[in-house]
Swiss-Prot record:
GO terms for biological process: defense response to bacterium. The modification Lysine amide is found at K15. Disulfide bonds: none annotated. The keyword Secreted applies. Expressed by the venom gland. The keyword Kinase does not apply. This is Lasioglossin-3. Belongs to the lasioglossin-like family. Keywords: Amidation, Antibiotic, Antimicrobial, DNA-binding, Secreted. One of its GO terms (cellular component) is extracellular region. It comes from Lasioglossum laticeps.
Amino acid sequence: VNWKKILGKIIKVVK
């Protein structure tokens, strides 16, 4: 699982 990709998507959604 690519946590960096998931975190990036979450950060994009949060921002």
